[in-house]
Amino acid sequence: MQNIPELAEIPGAVREEIATFLDQRREQVAEIGAPVTKAVSFLESFVLDGGKRVRPTYAWAGYLAAGRGEEDPTAMLRAAASLEFIQACALIHDDIIDASNTRRGNPTVHRGVEKLHRESEYLGDPEFFGTSVAILVGDLALVYAEDMFQDSGLSAAALHRARSPWRGMRTEVIGGQLLDISLEAAGSESVELANSVNRYKTAAYTIERPLHLGAAIAGASEELIAAFRGYGHDIGIAYQLRDDQLGVFGDPAVTGKPAGDDLREGKRTELLALALQRADESDPHAAATLRKLVGHTSDPQELSRLAQIIADSGAPEEIERRIDSLTQSGLQHLHAAKVDPTVTETLEQLAIKATARRK
């Protein structure tokens, strides 16, 4: 690679690397059998046709900010692109866990496979088949992430430096998901535990670890890595808090997900925990309604009622203040890093985009 891609060019460059990787796997997949080829086509569509490439972009930013070291930019781009397969695994499995029907405005993988089963008039239960295939497709995505990362062309020294963030990121996102569903099962109302989910399921995995990974590959100092991790922690949690707001109040035409999806699924978010605390003090009847219906209704009118109770509690305004505070704190960590002004400006823009988004 003669030209070093700018951060704005990374999403397109990542897509090209993923397409090349999948092309290189076609023969092996075809040898196994036509059903596998068809299953992999769902993964291919998922990773190529959607997504903002947030994680590869942050990994590339960490690499540039640390001065790139002696690593081949092409190898670094492949390593960054591999993060999209981890994201695919996480989302495909997350959609199964949440029984979601849509993702990015399209059918989720398990629903798409379920439709294939019906149209092909296969034997057995279509829903069970769709879930089973989607689990395996998600597993394959995780395998592909490891293959693409290890075969990226990075030096042995760079792979060694990357070992801690690479391992930590995968453990943290799975641990965060486990914590998430455990809180739902327990009906948790803890703000602190909801924040732990935000920390591990989103912040570390979406921003903090990708930045850490890119910087480590380039041989960054411990001081720079610490500054990046501080930025990633704060902006990542703010990103998830914004997601929680959209999960209750977002426009389906913009988000690509049904209105009130988090309420239907019973997500134990910081927004819900705060709303319950405030409603307990100001309107116990409303608090009782929240406890009774969250996670137990799909009725649009009841979901709208729950959203109104949360809005009336004042919790959304408190979440907005927290988003603003975390964004400012994250930017302070970034400015303390004193890296290339162009990279700093881009990371500032990414922070604002992540925390002020509407989808």
Range-by-range predicted roles:
Residues 64-66, 92-122, 146, 173-191, ...:
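Acidic, Mg2+-coordinating active-site segments of isoprenoid diphosphate-utilizing enzymes
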Residues 71-86, 131, 159-165, 224-235, ...:
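Alpha-helical scaffolds flanking conserved acidic
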Residues 1-83, 88, 92, 97-127, ...:
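Conserved N-terminal diphosphate/IPP-binding helix and adjacent helical/loop segment
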Residues 121, 125-154:
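A glycine/threonine-rich phosphate-anchoring loop and its flanking beta-alpha core
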Residues 304-359:
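Short hairpin/turn module used for nucleic-acid contact or packing/dimerization
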Residues 161-175:
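Conserved ATP-utilizing enzyme core subdomain
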Residues 149-164, 287-292:
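Transmembrane helix-loop-helix
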Residues 130-136, 192-202:
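A short glycine-threonine-serine/GTX helix/turn-capping micro-motif
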